[in-house]
Amino acid sequence: SINLYDFGCMRIFKSKFIQGVIDLYFALQKNDEALAVHAYEQWGFDDITKEKLDILSKWANFLYAPLMKDKVQKIQESDSGIYGAQIASEVHKELKKIGGVKPPKEFVFMDRAAVGLGSVFMHLRAEVNWYKVFHELIENFDQKKLTEKQQSTLKLVNL
């Protein structure tokens, strides 16, 4: 197992946000724009126009790409982060053209974690069936149960 710590910080993602991660996965898989808009709204984005949706989905398609195929593969075909940096640059430029976007705080933390973990898996040259792993992780996800568990755990530690 690999444990990553963000300089001693602990991130708590609300169940609604986690549900948005799952919903966006299925939205991208099924090319379901309404579900994608709903997912982004669960993350805290607002005013999702068709143009903004298309731009945000470029980045999402990059991040979710390894989860889309049921096969053993690297997290990214290239062993460098150049492709990801190019996608990020394109998305940034396109968002700037339409007036920008204020990313929700949780999105920034999740994005950092995804990029960081992706980098670790690239350097390890890990070949995994990411689709299978993701489906095993989300198989029994229950937003209500997670909310209850988070609330009781945070209360237990006075947070």
Where are these regions (language model features)?
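Helix-rich C-lobe and terminal helical cap/extension of kinase-like folds
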Residues: 1-159
